[in-house]
Every structure is written in C-alpha cells, then in structure tokens.
Amino acid sequence: MVVSSAKIHPASVVEDGAVIGENVKVGPFCHIGPNVVLGDGVELLSHVVVIGRTTIGKGTKIFPGAVIGGDSQSVHHSAVDTTLVIGENCTIREGVTMNTGTVEHGGTTVVGNNNLFLAYSHVAHDCRLGNNIILSNNVMLAGHVTVEDRAILGGGSAVHQFTRVGKQAFIGGLSAVSYDVIPYGMLNGNPGVLSGLNVVGMTRAGFERPVIHAVRRCYKQIFEGPESIRANAAAVRDEYLDCPPAMEILDFIAAESDRALSSPNRGGKG
C-alpha cells in the first residue's frame, strides 16, 4: 500500500505488499521488498535496498548504498521469516548494513530511536540497540550485541558477539570490544581495556560534579577492591542507593551475561 502523499521515483521498485506511509520520499534506484513497512516521513535518498520483514519508524533518513533487512550472516541461519525493527528519526549513512534476526534467538533485530549510523557501520542479527546511539564509520557489531542508550562507538571499533555496551559508554576508535563495557565507561585499545569514566559525556548529559565524583569513587571501589569485580560491586551497593548512575553500573555488573566484564587490565574479569 502506497499512500498518495508518498513520492516514489519512477526508477525505483516498490514490490506489492510493501506499506509506504505519509510523505515518504524514495529517490532513484531504490528497491523496497514486499514485507517492508516505511513509517511516515521516511526518506530513502537513492540506491537504497530495504528488504526482509523490515519496519522503519517515521522520520528516518537512509543514504545511498545502505542495505537494510538482509538475511543474517550467521552460519546457522534458517530460511525462516525473521524481522528487523528500526525506530524513529534515525540517520543511516552510506553503505550501512543491518540484518534481520535469527529464529534460534527470538527472530528480531531491534534498533531504537534517534540513532546515527555513519558510513559502512554494520548491525548484525539479533542485536538490541537503544536510543540516541552513535556508531561511527566502519563500526562492526557482531550478532546478539546489546548497546544501551547514548553510547558512542568510535570509528572502526568491533564488538564481539553477545557483548553488552552500557549506557553512555564511549568506545575509542579501532578498539576491539571482547567483554561487557559498564555504563559510563570508556574503553580503548586492542584488546580493549577500560580507561576510566566518560566524564565529558556525563557532564554534557547534565550530571552535577558531586554525582560524577560519587560515580568515580564507586568505579575505584569496583575495580581496585580486594575481591572480584562482581564481589566488590555487591559489597558497595548499599552506599550508592541514592546515586542513580552508580546504581546503573552496579545493576549492569550484577545482571546475567554471556561475557565477562571489561576491566582496566587486559582480559575480561568477573
């Protein structure tokens, strides 16, 4: 279904069954598959491929060369309908690729709202991305990766499958992220190691200095304490019940995960 207010270039292909919302703009040489839903105001500039069971939220803009909704690249991929859901007001730049999920793990790849994907970044099968995230050029997310709100991943960084990147974490360019990165953490290098807190990001987000100081103290207690990371975190939990960002870090550490935790030293720890 294509509404009358949509503008589709005659050189593009919209297959029967696709749902095209109000004021959608599709430039030349795009291909929209039969199971695609484009929300109101979505814009495909040119040479964009949107296939699979893909839903794109209103106001999202996609640049040339992007391939959105292709099958999972997992060697265990089954030829069963799976989905990709992209939220509202995302910007998806040139050459970006995003895959649908796998039936073995729920079947859906989810991308939130207001995210920026720079050129040639990749979102693999079954990833879960929050809101207001930036993936810089050539960032690679393997399957089942979780990226929480307001995280920033520097150019060329690569994230191992099943890894979690916490809220407002900052990943330096060309870093190899093999283990979970705590909220507000900064990680750099290959192999990636924690290099402290994303204080600049916390300041820009409006956290006051006493709160940032408290989170720094919590960070030191967790990673410089006498026991394991998780034991240290559990031991100091009651000290930070009134400090939401510190509690986000502590809750993140306490949660179940398939990966160990990134630390200031090489190698993941628990």
From Swiss-Prot:
Molecular function via GO: acyl-[acyl-carrier-protein]-UDP-N-acetylglucosamine O-acyltransferase activity
Location in the cell: Cytoplasm
Biological processes annotated in GO: lipid A biosynthetic process
Domain of life from the UniProt record: Bacteria
Known EC number: 2.3.1.129
Keyword Repeat: yes
Catalytically driven reaction(s): a (3R)-hydroxyacyl-[ACP] + UDP-N-acetyl-alpha-D-glucosamine = a UDP-3-O-[(3R)-3-hydroxyacyl]-N-acetyl-alpha-D-glucosamine + holo-[ACP]
GO CC terms: cytoplasm; membrane
Cited SUPFAM superfamilies: Trimeric LpxA-like enzymes
Pfam family, one: Acetyltransf_11
Keyword check for Oxidoreductase: no
Pathway(s) the chain acts in: Glycolipid biosynthesis; lipid IV(A) biosynthesis; lipid IV(A) from (3R)-3-hydroxytetradecanoyl-[acyl-carrier-protein] and UDP-N-acetyl-alpha-D-glucosamine: step 1/6
Keywords: Acyltransferase, Cytoplasm, Lipid A biosynthesis, Lipid biosynthesis, Lipid metabolism, Repeat, Transferase
Family: Belongs to the transferase hexapeptide repeat family. LpxA subfamily.
Classification via NCBIfam families: lipid_A_lpxA, PRK05289.1
Record text on subunit structure and interactions: Homotrimer.
Function of the protein: Involved in the biosynthesis of lipid A, a phosphorylated glycolipid that anchors the lipopolysaccharide to the outer membrane of the cell.
UniProt protein name: Acyl-[acyl-carrier-protein]--UDP-N-acetylglucosamine O-acyltransferase
Species for this entry: Sinorhizobium fredii (strain NBRC 101917 / NGR234)
Organism lineage: Bacteria, Pseudomonadati, Pseudomonadota, Alphaproteobacteria, Hyphomicrobiales
